[in-house]
């Protein structure tokens, strides 16, 4: 089983990636990078990462989140985060990245924010 499982679904013009597992150096961060790059190549620029199932993220995973955010921003797209675990929220607060990302607890609220 891969470190990170990603299920993709559409909610209107927003692509939601439901993620479960770990975003770590190696398979996890590569899986995220590959998914984001593919979506951008397909012209899908409104992306919501549902991180409810992500139990662990290391510095490589954090780096990949930032890299994804930057890549999507360069394409005039938007990357937003949904359902952060307390551990991940604390990590983003410590690294001052909580102020960079738009973070939501409600999927409906997150989806409405793209309009």
Where are these regions (language model features)?
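Short acidic-hydrophobic, aromatic-tinged amphipathic segments that line or gate anion-handling sites
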Residues: 102-106
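Acidic phosphotransfer microenvironment of two-component signaling modules
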Residues: 86, 108-109
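Amphipathic alpha-helical interaction surfaces in cytosolic regulatory modules
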Residues: 23-101
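Short hydrophobic/aromatic patches at helix-to-coil boundaries
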Residues: 111-115
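Residues at the C-termini of beta-strands that transition into short coil/loop
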Residues: 20, 107
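Short beta-strand/loop segment at the start of cytosolic alpha/beta domains
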Residues: 1-18
């Amino acid at each position: 089983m891969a470190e990170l499982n990603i299920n993709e679904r559409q909610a209107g013009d927003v692509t939601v990636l439901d993620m479960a597992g770990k975003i770590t150096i190696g398979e996890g961060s590569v899986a995220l990078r590959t998914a984001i790059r593919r979506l951008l190549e397909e012209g899908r620029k409104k992306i919501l990462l549902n991180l409810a199932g992500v139990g662990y993220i290391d510095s490589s995973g954090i780096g990949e989140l930032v890299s994804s955010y930057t890549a999507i921003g360069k394409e005039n797209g938007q990357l937003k985060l949904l359902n952060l675990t307390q551990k991940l929220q604390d990590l983003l607060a410590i690294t001052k990245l909580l102020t960079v990302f738009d973070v939501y607890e409600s999927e409906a609220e997150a989806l409405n924010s793209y309009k």
